[in-house]
């Protein structure tokens, strides 16, 4: 989802608690000794690059945070190091044990010590999706390096129209709070702070507690992850995620949408967010009337500050000339028929593109197409791809369709590209 800010408090004046509900200060006092600030430090200078939060979940010092808080260290352990600071000011080095990229979770371990550490437990109801909508919650973290802060809000259930499982929390989660706990009145963990929605007020998100609990259990029965294994494990998780996603994509219905003289397939699944727009009533009067439809699923898998994946977008725009002659309309379409160039980054190669003309069948218009892809440098057979298709049978109307995918094997990209092109047909 565009507009999500990772590593995301607004402190409201305390009100007298309702009967049976603990005061905010009681919740904080009960959790304080389990709280951590987690810092990714630049190795040489020791200055923080990323600051987040975390919380201890067992007496031996196992702690939960977000993957994106430790992502730089995970990918570049020679350039960064991990450090924690607890509520008493104790600090030390952290060991990265495991992560769940799709859930944006990581497990770290604090150094051993003689005295057992205070630990938070998971709310059993949260492990079964049993938290009631509207139930009061408290989110804790260290926003903007200002010190540990507690924020009161409400549990608003799982987010609709999202492929990734997230809980909507109506409380302010600010930068630095990512990885901190969201607690129930029983002072047990119901979720992990992960993000806020930019452009909205008190729209924040939690990773459901069951994902953190599952990661903890796996870590207790498996050997700790060696740093040299991190990239390979990330690649495995990305590969597993995209295979599951495209299998789910095959299981949904695809219905033809009508665009003037054409039809084009659109996904029918709750986890797609679809919007439509038109400029027909704009002023001044447009010379070309456009009607657009866009469907997008954005699970926003954060791999690194230079690499986010997990997006699929399908867009169709029907264009009808009002005042342009055929030559002018062709020039207008040429300007619209373009894909942004990608020269490559530290994490991906530059784009390579192929253009041509195709017609899926006798019932389909001929399409001018361009297909672009760039590969992930760190992960084999994973690509970002974009496909653009334009009808070319008329001097006064046209359909421009776009498919964009981030994080796909080439075989899955070709399969989705074929489905996309074959879905563009004449309207009967």
Feature locations, PLM:
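Flexible, gly/ser-rich surface segments that form the specificity/activation loops bordering the active-site cleft
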Residues: 19-23, 69-74, 118-165, 174, ...
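C-terminal cap/linker of serine protease catalytic domains
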Residues: 20-28, 94, 116, 189-262
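A conserved glycine-rich beta-strand in the N-terminal activation segment of trypsin-fold
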Residues: 20-24, 41-60, 91-93, 203
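Catalytic-histidine neighborhood of serine endopeptidases
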Residues: 51, 58-103, 110-113
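Catalytic nucleophile loop of clan PA
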Residues: 55-56, 172-193
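Surface-exposed amphipathic alpha-helical segments
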Residues: 213, 223, 270-272, 394-428
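Secretory pathway targeting signatures of secreted, lumenal, and periplasmic proteins
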Residues: 272-335
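Signature of long, low-cysteine stretches enriched in small and polar/charged residues
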Residues: 329-394
